[in-house]
Each structure stands twice: as C-alpha cells, then as structure tokens.
A protein has these predicted regions:
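Conserved strand-turn element in the central/C-terminal portion of the radical SAM core barrel
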Residues: 42, 116, 140, 144-148, ...
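Canonical Radical SAM [4Fe-4S] cluster-binding loop centered on the CxxxCxxC motif
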Residues: 15-61
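Conserved SAM/AdoMet-binding glycine-rich loop
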Residues: 67-175
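Aromatic/hydrophobic pocket-lining residues that form the small-molecule binding cavity
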Residues: 59, 92, 122, 161, ...
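Auxiliary Fe-S-binding modules of radical SAM enzymes
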Residues: 1-18, 23, 203-309
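Short, solvent-exposed loop/turn segments at secondary-structure boundaries
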Residues: 51-54, 88-90, 150-154, 187-191, ...
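Short glycine-enriched, charge-decorated loop/helix-capping segments at active-site entrances
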Residues: 45-50, 151-156, 232-238
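Hydrophobic faces of well-ordered beta-strands that scaffold small-molecule active sites
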Residues: 27, 77, 109-111, 137-139, ...
Length: 309
C-alpha cells in the first residue's frame, strides 16, 4: 500500500490527522479524536476536542470498507488519534481482531499511547491485546526529568514511563519511545539534567529479556499556537541553539548504559540536526563521535531550511 489512507475522519468536518513517520504506508483508522492531554510544546490537536468514537460498528464499517477497497494490500494499520490506547481494553481487542479478519496480510496494528493509560490496563488485558494481534505503542516520553515533564503538562513521571515500558515488554508489545531535545530550554544546568535523566530513563526501560525496542529523539520546534511559543514571546522560555541541542544529544547518548541491547536508536526525523541510526549501546561510540563532529563543525548539521515537523 503506497502512502497512508484514512477512514473515519469524523464525517461532518475535515481534520488534520497525525501519525508517526514510520506509519507513512499504514491504513489510518479513527478510533478517537484529538488527544487526552494539552502539552505546552504541541499544537497538533488544538482544533479538536478530545472524544472517543462510541459506535464500534461504525468503526468496524470503516475497517470493512477499507478491506473491500484495498484487499490484501494492507499490511499495517495505525489507530488514530493522539491517544487511541485510552479506549477500553475489550473494545481495542475487538477492533484489533476485526482488523486482522478484514485484512488477511496484516502484520502490524499500532497506536499512540500515554503511560498512564498503559498502566491502567491489567497485565492480562495487555496480553489479550497482543494475542488479538496488536503489536506496538508509540509513546511521547519527551524527558526523564520530572520537573520538565511537569512544566510541559505531560501528566506522567519517569517512574510511570519506566513501569509502562516494562509492562509492554512483558506483554509482548513493541515499545517506541520519543524524546524531545531542547524541551528544558537554554539553561545549561536544566538542559544537562534533562539529558541525563532521559538517559537514566532509557536505562530503566530496557527489557529484562532480549527483544527489540525503539528510541527516537526529536528536536523542539515552537509551532504556532503552542503554549511554549507564547512563553517564548513573553521571555519565559528561551530555546536552545543548535550547538546546545547537539550537546544535549551527546549527554543523552553518553549517559546510556554500555550494555544496552536490541535498542534501535534513530534521529532521522526532519526536526533533528544530525541523522543517526543504529543500536544503543553497540553503536554508542560511533554515535558520540558523529555528534561531537556536529558540535565542532556547523557544516555537518542539517541546515535550518531543511528542518521541520
């Protein structure tokens, strides 16, 4: 299937839908509308009041219509919107099973998730969800620093993320954690604490048994409508320079454990100044060398005009 296609875009009004970059070729199925949280750095869901689609048969109809239209071409389905994992476990299980029934070559069903909603689900619920064919959650962690998390209205702590990751690992749900470089602002002490605590959290999230898991740092962009942009205009928040961002990335990587395994680390997102892809800690030394080169030589960095969300 070439490119994302969306079913169930809330019929009466056209909305922007957002999905992880790696879900570019997925079928997008609307299960919720908007996001359960209003983080200071995010402007993606400002036009949407959060709600859950109540009519399960209506969602199934979207899944069925997509099956008729695309046949066996659909291999990945992403459940929209900002936090589809908030939906009750039995409903998610029912929808996941139906996705597989209608799309015979389906190999991946995923969604965005908030740590608190993962923690609300029992271990048995998560295991039944995996048995139904649900495969991955994308979790916007942003930081391991509890103060930064509080300041940006994230609604979770480092402990929450560490426990949520372990619950997913144990259930067999793939974990993709997203961090946000620059979120602490340009204060050197706060920036370093943001990086070091984020590395500490990565170490705590490592699965007890071998399995692939994913970490993807992005770089803060102060987008129109976001609270953090308003804070910047009021001189309450000052963003990091590109050099500071790379120093933060260096500290984050440098403070991760050397013995991390199967952790796919990716900074290919267009917001970042450097593109790295490999494994922590197998490729840790190489990552540090490349980030150090970017710190020393601005020519190595992605130009500002090529960056974006």
């Amino acid at each position: 299937m070439q490119g994302s296609f969306t079913f169930g875009v809330w019929k009466t009004k056209l909305y922007y839908l957002f999905r992880p970059p790696s879900e570019w070729d997925s079928l997008l199925i609307s299960v919720t509308n908007g996001c359960t949280h209003r983080c200071t750095f995010c402007s993606m869901y400002l036009t949407k009041k959060f709600s859950v689609r109540k009519d399960i048969e209506d969602i199934k109809s979207d899944i069925h219509k997509a099956g008729k239209m695309f046949g066996s071409r659909v291999e990945k389905i992403f459940l929209e919107d900002g936090n589809a994992f908030v939906v009750k476990s039995n409903i998610l299980i029912e929808l996941t099973k139906y996705c597989h029934q209608q799309h015979p070559n389906l190999r991946k069903v995923s969604s965005y998730a908030h740590a608190k909603d993962i923690l609300k689900k029992s271990d048995d619920d998560l295991k039944r969800l995996v048995d139904a064919g649900f495969t991955m959650v994308y979790v916007g962690i942003e930081s391991g620093d509890d103060q930064v998390l509080k300041d940006c209205n994230k609604g979770a702590t480092q402990d929450d993320y560490a426990l949520a990751a372990q619950k997913c690992h144990q259930a067999g749900i793939d974990w993709s954690g997203i961090f946000l470089l620059g979120l602490a602002g340009n204060d050197p002490e706060k920036s370093r604490r943001h990086a070091v605590e984020s590395a500490k959290l990565i170490n705590r999230m490592a699965p007890a048994k071998p399995r692939k898991w994913y970490i993807s740092p992005l770089t803060l962009e102060m987008t129109p409508g976001s609270e953090i942009l308003a804070q910047n205009l009021e001189k309450k928040f000052q963003p990091c320079t590109s050099t500071h961002i790379l120093e933060e990335l260096y500290a984050l990587i440098g403070n991760t454990a050397d013995d991390l395994t199967d952790c796919i680390f990716n900074t290919n997102h267009a917001s970042n100044y450097l593109s790295l892809k490999g494994e922590l800690g197998k490729d840790k030394k190489d990552f540090l060398c490349r980030v150090e080169a970017g710190i020393k030589d601005p020519k190595v960095r992605r130009p500002e005009y090529m960056r974006g969300l």
